[in-house]
């Protein structure tokens, strides 16, 4: 299924920008993703990029959490970037927002590559499939399964926030994010 999704994204990208990207104005559309299927007491799941899954029991204890390659490697990646790009001495984010050459270099170096600090994005590139993480979890004791994007990462580190979200109280992350919940009966 993920191969099909990834190839459909490539067809979309080719129809809009052609066969070549400049990693800037003609950059490929890409996305992070997560999903899964429950059969019996087993959840088969996957994630790529900063889309994640959190599995909780009825007391809101974390049973399982997917690996967020973007966040996990971000500090190491920043150190590596500072070594390789000497003119960066301040925030990487500042350069991302204001330095086109840096954005081009970063995308070529760190998205869907063999670089040990790279992360995946479903953008049609075959390499994206190598960055997908797969999981098999026993979920007999699971009650809540949350699928979310990076905007909710910090929110979901706090148990009180998790309880508020599950009980459908109003809660807004500091940055944009998507949250989908499932209650297992």
Spans of features found by a protein language model:
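PP2C/PPM-type serine/threonine phosphatase catalytic domain
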Residues: 1-185
């Amino acid at each position: 299924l993920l191969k099909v999704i990834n190839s459909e994204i490539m067809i979309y990208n080719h129809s809009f920008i052609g066969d070549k990207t400049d990693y800037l104005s003609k950059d490929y559309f890409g996305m992070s993703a997560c999903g899964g299927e429950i059969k019996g007491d087993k959840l088969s799941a996957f994630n790529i990029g900063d889309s994640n899954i959190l599995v909780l029991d009825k007391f809101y204890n974390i049973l399982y959490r997917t690996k967020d390659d973007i966040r996990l490697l971000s500090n190491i990646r920043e150190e590596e970037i500072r070594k390789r790009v000497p003119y960066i001495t301040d925030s990487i984010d500042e350069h991302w927002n204001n330095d086109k050459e840096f954005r081009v270099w970063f995308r070529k170096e760190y998205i869907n590559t063999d670089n040990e600090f790279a992360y995946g994005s479903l953008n049609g590139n075959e390499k994206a499939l190598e960055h997908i993480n797969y999981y098999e979890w026993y979920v007999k004791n699971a009650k809540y399964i949350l699928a979310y994007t990076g905007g909710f990462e910090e929110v979901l580190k706090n148990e009180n926030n998790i309880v508020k979200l599950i009980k459908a109280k109003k809660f807004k992350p500091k940055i944009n994010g998507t949250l989908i919940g499932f209650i297992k009966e």
